[in-house]
Amino acid sequence: MSLSFSENTLISTSQPMSQPTIPPSMTSSLPIIISFDGNIGSGKSTKVKDIEKYYQEQGRTDILFIQEPVDEWNSIVDEKGVTILSNYYKDQKRFAFRLQMLAYISRLALLRRASKMGYKYIITERCVGTDRNVFSKMLYDKGDIEHDEYTIYKKWYDEFIIDVPIGAIVYIKASPEVCLERVNIRAREGENIPLEYLKECDKYHDEWIDGETIPKLIINADIDLNKNPEEKLEILKQFDTFI
C-alpha cells in the first residue's frame, strides 16, 4: 500500500515490530520514529527499501515508511527552471538558508501528518534532527548561514520538535570516498558534490550521533550489499534484534 502526501512524495506501509526502548520524553500517543541517517550516497534509501520489503514479506501492517522528499525539493525551481538543489551546490552561501528551511518544512510536514495516521512505528529516511544537527549546523559553522538566519531556523525547530520526537537512530556509516563513488554512479540531477563536502558531512554526522542518548544501531555501509547477500541478511537480522 502506498500513500501520497504530496505530488511526488510516497509513503508506503508495512507491519508491527516489537517495541524498542522509548525515551521518557515520548508520549504513548505518538508513534515511535526510527530515523535512518547517514551521509549523502551512504545507501540509506537502499537499506530502507530492503527493510520495507523484509517486513512486507512478513505481512506486517503497522509500520509506515517515509522516503526523503527529494522530488519535492526538485520541484522548487527559479525563474530559469533551475532546481534549488542545483543552485545550492553551485552557490552554497546564497542558497543555504532557503534550502535548509525547505528541507525542514517538507520533512516536518510529512512526519506530522504521518504521526496522526495511527501507525505504531514510522521509519524515515533522515529526520528533522538530521537537518538541525548536521546540515544546518555545518552551514552555520562555515558562515554560509548567517547568525540571524540560524536563530530563525532554531526557533522553528524548537517549536515543532515535540510533535515528531525521534525514538531511535540507524546510522548507515560509509566512508566519504565510497559515498562519492556512489553519488557519481547514480548521477542525480543537481548532485555535483565535492569530496570535501562529504567529509564535512561525515564529521557532523559522527559528532551528532555520538552525542545522542537514544538507542542507536551503526551499520557498516562500505560493503556493496548487491554483491554480498549474506551481509544484507545479517543487517536485516541486526535491525530485528535492535528493534
Q: What is the meaning of each model-derived region?
A:
Residues 5, 180-243:
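NTP-dependent small-molecule kinase module
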Residues 36:
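Hydrophobic anchor at the beta1->P-loop junction of P-loop NTPases
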Residues 40:
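The conserved Walker
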Residues 44:
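Conserved lysine of the Walker
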Residues 47:
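Hydrophobic positions on the alpha1 helix immediately C-terminal to the Walker A/P-loop
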Residues 53-100:
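Conserved substrate/cofactor phosphate-moiety recognition/catalytic segment
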Residues 80-121, 143-144:
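Conserved nucleotide-sensing/catalytic segment adjacent to the nucleotide-binding pocket
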Residues 132-203:
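A glycine- and Lys/Arg-enriched "phosphate-lid" helix/loop adjacent to the NTP-binding pocket
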